[in-house]
């Protein structure tokens, strides 16, 4: 198939146009014509939208993928990445056997990658861990996981790390993208994840995008918004960003604001609502309470960093009891004039925006993604968004609500719901709550006190701890942090190459991370294994294994469970723990955690022709079903109810809580949510008093801003054709050809000032590192003067050499959207 860039973009535009016109691509006709191809369903491997894909296999290979016409999410459509899913597993450089750095027949950190057996790989890993545990606390061994990990894999990891090896140093790459959203949900509602669903799109009058380029990052949802905008009466779209991108093409109100000023804009909107008597007092009085946040909370940098001095970093997450009058006073400072001064947004646009939120007749949905979350005040800005929806009662009902969109296919279903964060357990439970720990130990049949109650090193702290020698073993799975993590020059790379440390990367390809590791483990991808994802609207979707992985590739699930056989309880648990459960003495962690009478009690069905399950063949039981049902027991009866495992293989996903076989579309609202009692109307039942929190916090400046030397803002992100670090998409010929290399987008005036022209080779320089790229002053992204935009998919241009590892001090999520940079001709 030959596809030039112009045809490629026209094709994608045609897909969006077809969606806007209500046309369904005739997938089933295509399917019927392909004789000899077996078709089955699976959720897409990429973003958090959760599109369902029909996967065509023949002769042991995936040969085609099509949008699933029976799926409610995407209705037969796929974005351009989804249409080429069949090719992601067949790059020429698949890693097909374990590779260890060796010299003279033994491990050497400076040696060359040498093929070894799985037994050799697991033996050296186990030896390293056991040696560390003899000298240090368990948090010195770590895992870096992913929002792309399946539900089963994530749950197995949590069990092995927190219960088996007794380390809370397990964190996902979702720390970099969804932590602020998750923490804000918990602080506001006492429960994680959105209350609404995608059905809001067809019921809303107004859509406001904050830091979200849905046209390229969630194109199928964007096609539904486009359809609603073009076919509905008086439907409006507002797009807000620090630069102009493709979503602006549909915007009725396009708004460009200065970095970090979204804080001031949201406080202005809250002030406008109050000053113009648009507060829904009935809702506010019944269903909310007020708190004030800690201020001057720092930037999540190393404690010795100058920006951390004199701050309230240690109490950053505190919320103090407050009332409406104090909240009113906090936001009253943010007048139209002040919001304009801080944000640079014209006053008429600010007022138009505020009126939309304040108008009780307008159904309004707010969408946001990384522009909001990757923010040194990401938790605050998320909570500010909830403030304006709570003040107006525009929440938890059809067509109204705040909606945090996830960027990965199971950032919700695995990272958040399963709990692969340093502080979490399944179903919103946390390791710092003794009751939650006791519940987990009961379900897992553990001695009391097995699960440690001190969180380990979070994602950014892992890099620092590796560099400092406090973390000595790291196993990275299903992610590429050496390319995707922040400040890799100063923090990440030194820790990975620290001779005290041993780094393992499970990866299907020789990614930037893999080639920096000590041991590479070949991993299965997507439908080479059985899996499950949870998307942004709480929809859980499962799929069956459809082909085998190449060579000696094994799923991450197989790797975790098989590796557990290399440890006996006597080697990793204290005598005090073993005395409580003497029957566990001498047993492997595999026997205690997985072959434990619960996880191993199911067998794979034999009545499905052609159905394969490599894990069941190896372990002798239906591992995925056993893990799922045990995991589901955490949430059933607690507002996180999942349907029985087998049900999910018969449907295109269900949105939890699923009670009595019925999914929940709008949480917390009577008539939709089975946990809201008759007469309550709305109950935010994650909090003991059923009330949501409205939080008063101010605008605070970013960690780093342009100055005389580093005179531009740097914002990083993605493009339509590629996903994250490009490990998969750059190996799809059509996608690589359409967008082969990273670019830097700059305003023509800024280019002229620097003697630069479109297409020039340029060098980007920050206080942390530099990178060579090419300049684009005419393309799809149009930046304002003073700001440049670039992406991170290109392994040949390591953008994260430039970025600052400042984080939100409450969520520890990284701010990739703003630091100071200078650009010169290369």
From Swiss-Prot:
What InterPro entries is this protein classified in? Asp_de-COase-like_dom_sf, CT_Nitrate-R-NapA-like, MoPterin_dinucl-bd_dom, Mopterin_OxRdtase, Mopterin_OxRdtase_4Fe-4S_dom, MopterinOxRdtase_cofactor_BS, Periplasm_NO3_reductase_lsu, Prok_molybdopt-oxidoreductase
Q: Subunit structure, briefly?
A: Component of the periplasmic nitrate reductase NapAB complex composed of NapA and NapB.
- Give the family this protein belongs to, as stated in its UniProt record: Belongs to the prokaryotic molybdopterin-containing oxidoreductase family. NasA/NapA/NarB subfamily.
What species does this protein belong to?
Answer: Actinobacillus succinogenes (strain ATCC 55618 / DSM 22257 / CCUG 43843 / 130Z)
Quote the protein name from its UniProt record.
Answer: Periplasmic nitrate reductase
**What is the main EC category here?**
oxidoreductase
The free-text note explaining how the cofactor binds reads: Binds 1 [4Fe-4S] cluster.
What processing steps or modifications follow its translation?
Predicted to be exported by the Tat system. The position of the signal peptide cleavage has not been experimentally proven.
Q: Does the keyword RNA-binding apply?
A: no
Q: Which cofactor does it need?
A: [4Fe-4S] cluster; Mo-bis(molybdopterin guanine dinucleotide)
Which GO molecular function, any one, fits this protein according to its record? molybdopterin cofactor binding
Provide the catalytic activity annotation. Answer: 2 Fe(II)-[cytochrome] + nitrate + 2 H(+) = 2 Fe(III)-[cytochrome] + nitrite + H2O
Q: Provide the binding site for substrate.
A: 792
State the gene name recorded for this protein: napA
Q: Which SMART domains match?
A: Molybdop_Fe4S4
Main function: Catalytic subunit of the periplasmic nitrate reductase complex NapAB. Receives electrons from NapB and catalyzes the reduction of nitrate to nitrite.
- This entry's Enzyme Commission designation comes to 1.9.6.1
Positions of [4Fe-4S] cluster binding: 44, 47, 51, 79
Recorded hits in PROSITE patterns, A to Z, give: 4FE4S_MOW_BIS_MGD, MOLYBDOPTERIN_PROK_1, TAT
| Domain 4Fe-4S Mo/W bis-MGD-type positions | 37-93
This protein's record includes keyword Cell division: no
Question: Sorted alphabetically, which keywords does the UniProt record give?
Answer: 4Fe-4S, Electron transport, Iron, Iron-sulfur, Metal-binding, Molybdenum, Nitrate assimilation, Oxidoreductase, Periplasm, Signal, Transport
């Amino acid at each position: 198939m030959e596809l030039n860039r112009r045809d490629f973009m026209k094709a994608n535009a045609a897909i969006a146009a077809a969606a806007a016109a209500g046309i369904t691509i005739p997938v089933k006709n295509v399917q019927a014509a392909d004789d000899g191809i077996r078709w089955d369903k699976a959720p897409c491997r990429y973003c958090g939208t959760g599109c369902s894909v029909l996967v065509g296999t023949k002769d042991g290979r995936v040969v085609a993928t099509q949008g699933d016409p029976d799926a409610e999410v995407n209705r037969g459509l796929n974005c351009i990445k989804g249409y080429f899913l069949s090719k992601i597993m067949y790059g020429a450089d698949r890693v097909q056997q374990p590779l260890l750095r060796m010299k003279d027949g033994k491990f050497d950190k400076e040696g060359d990658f040498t093929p070894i057996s799985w037994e050799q790989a697991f033996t050296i890993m186990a030896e390293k861990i056991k040696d560390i545990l003899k000298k240090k606390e368990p948090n010195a061994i770590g895992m870096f996981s992913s929002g792309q990990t399946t539900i089963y894999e994530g749950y197995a990891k949590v069990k092995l790390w927190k219960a088996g090896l007794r380390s809370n140093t397990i964190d996902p790459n979702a720390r970099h993208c969804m932590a602020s959203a998750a923490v804000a949900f918990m602080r506001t509602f006492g429960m994680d994840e959105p209350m609404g669903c995608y059905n809001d799109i067809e019921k809303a009058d107004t859509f406001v995008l904050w830091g979200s380029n849905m046209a390229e990052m969630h194109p199928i949802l964007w096609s539904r918004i486009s359809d609603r905008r073009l076919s509905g009466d008086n439907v409006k779209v507002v797009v807000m960003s620090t630069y102009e991108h493709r979503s602006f093409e549909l915007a009725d109100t396009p708004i460009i604001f200065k970095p970090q000023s979204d804080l001031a804009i949201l406080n202005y909107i809250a002030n406008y609502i109050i000053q113009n008597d648009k507060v829904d007092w009935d809702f506010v009085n019944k269903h909310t309470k007020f708190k004030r946040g800690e201020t001057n909370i720092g930037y999540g940098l190393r404690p010795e960093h100058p920006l951390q001095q004199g701050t309230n970093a240690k109490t950053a997450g505190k919320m103090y009891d407050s009332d409406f009058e104090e909240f009113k006073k906090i936001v009253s400072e943010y007048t139209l004039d002040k919001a304009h001064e801080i944000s640079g947004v014209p006053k008429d646009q600010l007022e138009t925006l505020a009126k939309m939120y304040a108008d009780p007749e307008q159904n309004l949905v707010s969408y946001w993604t990384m522009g909001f979350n990757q923010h040194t005040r990401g938790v605050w800005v998320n909570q500010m968004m909830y403030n304006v929806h709570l003040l107006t009662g525009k929440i938890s009902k059809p067509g109204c609500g705040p909606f945090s969109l996830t960027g990965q296919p199971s950032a919700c279903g695995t990272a958040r719901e399963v709990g692969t964060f340093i502080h979490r357990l399944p179903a919103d439970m946390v390791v710092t709550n003794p009751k939650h720990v006791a519940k987990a130990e009961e379900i897992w049949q553990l001695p009391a006190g097995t699960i440690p109650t001190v969180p380990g090193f979070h994602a950014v702290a892992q890099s620092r701890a590796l560099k400092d020698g406090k973390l000595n073993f790291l196993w990275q799975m299903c992610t590429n942090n050496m390319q995707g993590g922040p400040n890799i020059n100063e923090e990440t790379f030194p820790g990975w190459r620290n001779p005290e440390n041993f780094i393992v990367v499970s990866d299907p390809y020789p990614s930037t991370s893999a080639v920096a590791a000590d041991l590479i483990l070949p991993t299965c991808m997507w439908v080479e294994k059985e899996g499950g994802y949870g998307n942004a609207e709480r929809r859980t979707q499962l799929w069956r294994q459809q082909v085998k992985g190449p060579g000696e590739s094994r799923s991450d699930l197989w790797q975790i469970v098989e590796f557990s056989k290399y440890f006996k309880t006597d080697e990793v648990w204290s005598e005090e723990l073993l005395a409580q459960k003497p029957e566990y003495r001498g047993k492997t962690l595999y026997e205690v955690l997985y072959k434990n009478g619960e996880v191993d009690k199911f067998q794979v069905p034999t009545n499905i022709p052609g159905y394969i399950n490599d894990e069941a063949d190896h372990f002798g039981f239906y591992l995925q079903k056993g893990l799922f049902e045990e995991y589901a027991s955490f949430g059933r009866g607690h507002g996180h109810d999942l349907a029985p495992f087998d049900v999910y293989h018969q449907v295109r996903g269900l949105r939890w809580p699923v009670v009595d076989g019925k999914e929940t579309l709008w949480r917390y609202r009577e008539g939709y949510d089975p946990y809201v009692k008759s007469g309550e109307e709305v109950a935010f039942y994650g909090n003991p008093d059923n009330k949501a929190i409205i939080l008063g916090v101010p605008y605070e400046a970013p960690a780093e801003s342009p100055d005389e030397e580093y005179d531009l803002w740097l914002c990083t992100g993605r493009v339509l054709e590629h996903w994250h670090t490009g490990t998969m998409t750059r190996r799809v010929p059509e996608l690589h050809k359409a967008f082969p290399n990273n670019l830097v987008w700059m305003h023509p005036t800024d280019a002229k000032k620097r003697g630069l022209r479109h297409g020039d080779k340029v060098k980007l320089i920050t206080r942390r590192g530099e990178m060579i790229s090419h300049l684009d002053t005419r393309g799809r992204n149009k930046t304002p003067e003073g700001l440049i935009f670039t992406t991170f998919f290109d392994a040949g241009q390591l953008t994260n050499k430039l970025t600052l590892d400042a984080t939100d001090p409450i969520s520890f999520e990284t701010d990739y959207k703003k630091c100071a940079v200078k650009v010169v001709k290369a």
